[in-house]
From Swiss-Prot:
Site, as annotated: Important for efficient shutoff activity and nuclear localization: 195, 198-199
Domain notes: The probable endonuclease active site in the N-terminus and the basic amino acid cluster in the C-terminus are important for the shutoff activity. The C-terminus acts as a nuclear localization signal. The C-terminus is recruited to host protein complexes involved in nuclear Pol II RNA processing.
Cellular compartment(s): Host cytoplasm; Host nucleus
InterPro entries noted in UniProt: PA/PA-X (IPR001009), PA/PA-X_sf (IPR038372)
Gene that encodes the chain: PA
Keywords: Decay of host mRNAs by virus, Eukaryotic host gene expression shutoff by virus, Host cytoplasm, Host gene expression shutoff by virus, Host mRNA suppression by virus, Host nucleus, Host-virus interaction
Name listed for the protein in its UniProt record: Protein PA-X
Site (Important for efficient shutoff activity): 202-203
Superkingdom: Viruses
Coiled coil start-end: none
Length: 252
């Protein structure tokens, strides 16, 4: 799984995920499923904000790569992936500037058009189950929740999906690609099932002669940036085009 993560994700995302795990005492080389989960969540957050700007009339517009955006304001402030202290500084600054209530937990993004924080989730389970867990934890009507699954399902607060359909399709396609690449390497089942993941972890450590003295029980402490993962969909009419925008993972 570690090799898969390093081959299939942008090096910047991998570096941020490693830094986050180490901040919480987690080892990317041991808790490889969590490593993959964090990288996936970070990439979804970055894709969520990609190409979205606000023009001089306050309208949300999409600017494709290569087009001029020098005079435009980014629609989304990315909070996910920042150092914890820096992230809270950004949140406090946004709250002081906009008057929006301060969230209890660090959100992932801030939407300058809708003036709201956004919590992104990526789940391997039913989207409505994970959505309710998020809502019960956050307990704030001011933070907008948007959940994606690997099955192509999504759920958002008040059915407000924030982004246009094509932007969301890009995210779903990327999740589909990740799932397919994992499956082709025999990694998907252990990624979905915690029990299988634990069994695989012990097997890997044993094969490396590292079992003694090393923890084989996966930590249940959850990093704020870690959102659970799972299964996927794709509209066949645009799958080839959208999927081509992502580099194919290298075979081992």
């Amino acid at each position: 799984m570690e090799d898969f993560v390093r081959q299939c994700f942008n090096p910047m995302i991998v570096e941020l995920a490693e830094k986050t795990m180490k901040e919480y005492g987690e080892n990317p080389k041991i808790e490889t499923n969590k490593f993959a989960a964090i990288c996936t969540h970070m990439e979804v957050c970055f894709m969520y904000s990609d190409f979205h700007f606000i023009n001089e009339r306050g309208e949300s517009i999409i600017v494709e790569p290569g087009d001029s955006n020098a005079l435009l304001k980014h629609r989304f402030e990315i909070i996910e992936g920042r150092d914890r202290n820096v992230a809270w500084t950004v949140v406090n600054s946004i709250c002081n500037t906009t008057g929006v209530g301060k969230p209890k937990f660090l959100p992932d993004l801030y939407d300058y058009k809708e003036d709201r924080f956004i919590e992104i989730g990526v789940t391997r389970r039913e989207v409505h189950v994970y959505y309710l867990e998020k809502a019960n934890k956050i307990k704030s009507e001011e933070t907008h929740i948007h959940i994606f699954s690997f099955t192509g399902e999504e759920m958002a607060t008040k059915a407000d999906y924030t982004l246009d359909e094509e932007s969301r399709a890009r995210i779903k396609t990327r999740l589909f690609t990740i799932r397919q690449e994992m499956a082709s390497r025999g990694l998907w089942d252990s990624f979905v099932s915690p029990r299988e993941a634990k069994r695989q972890l012990k097997k890997d450590l044993r094969s490396q002669g590292q079992c003694e003295g090393l923890p084989t029980k996966v930590s249940h402490q959850t990093s704020p940036v870690l959102k659970t993962l799972e299964p996927m969909w794709m509209d066949s009419s645009r799958m080839a085009t959208l999927r081509a925008s992502f580099p194919k993972c290298l075979e081992k």
